[in-house]
From Swiss-Prot:
The gene is gpd1l. Substrate binds at K123, R272, N273. Keywords: Cytoplasm, NAD, Oxidoreductase. The keyword Cytoplasm applies. NCBIfam families: glycerol3P_DH (TIGR03376). The active site is at K207. It catalyses: sn-glycerol 3-phosphate + NAD(+) = dihydroxyacetone phosphate + NADH + H(+). Its EC number is 1.1.1.8. GO terms for molecular function: glycerol-3-phosphate dehydrogenase (NAD+) activity; NAD binding; protein homodimerization activity. GO terms for cellular component: cytoplasm. Its main location: cytoplasm. This is Glycerol-3-phosphate dehydrogenase 1-like protein. It comes from Xenopus tropicalis.
Amino acid sequence: MALAGPLKVCIVGSGNWGSAVAKIIGHNVKNLKKFASTVNMWVFEENINGRKLTEIINTEHENVKYLPGYKLPENVVAVPNLSDAVKDADLLIFVIPHQFIHKICQEISGKVHRNALGITLIKGIDEGPEGLRLISDIIREKMDIDVSVLMGANIANEVAAEKFCETTIGSKNKEHGLLFKELLQTPNFRITVVEDADTVELCGALKNIVAVAAGFCDGLGCGDNTKAAVIRLGLMEMIAFANVFCKGPVSIATFLESCGVADLITTCYGGRNRKVSEAFVKSGKSIEELEKEMLNGQKLQGPQTSAEVYRILQQKNMVNKFPLFTAVYQICYEGKPVEDVISCLQSHPEHM
């Protein structure tokens, strides 16, 4: 690897999770000579009570909109211009809603040196004319850099509060994975590096669909046994989907890492996909209304991912092999009754 230190880090994104990660990286680079001591964080500029969000972050060292109550290290610098933020960066941490990745990559393509490395923390997938496209593939194609992925049972506020958790880095180049582990690991944020990067990334996207189904169950008052069935059948569909759509071999062991079963459980019991989906059942409001009310306007990944997965399954003529994924899509977008989530469990092919 031809990167010479100290390595400059740029975080592309500054929402709830991006800010929590900035807190970790800002602290870590102060103590590691391998990394430059200042970290750029690209912030989509917003006005908060008449003040620019970047100005608030750079003076008060807190993202008052997306991670209120947690101080960011003073060496994390909020930069409103994307090209300025990534200038001379050696390591790029992508942590934005997945629907913006094309636009962001187009904007910075050619502005990052060719030895730079990326890691995506983005939980989502995309669809192309050939079917499934992973976010890491899009970054790799548009920017011509090597890209690792990080996924795990990581609710952002708990990470920011330094409560113990694990996470998984997937990297086809072990050396690159270990470099990002060095940048990100703390005593309370423990990292395992695996080479099955595509499965790690798929887990991070697909578990949000299952969490929506879990939220529907909570809204219907179904109880813990039903939710356990949602989690198990959801995991079976995740594994089946990976076996069909991953280009390389899929290791079942990857599903036992933090990115797999652990992230699935935490998202189905905590996490915003579950919470908003429960409110969707109880309030009768649309997902869009609830995003505005409950998430400060941030986007929910589960419903969008279910729509992308549904279109990919349609292309392959495999919709009825994934009844849980399909039910979530149809309830969110086609006005099907929420009770369909239960009937899809009752007649699931796993039981036939």
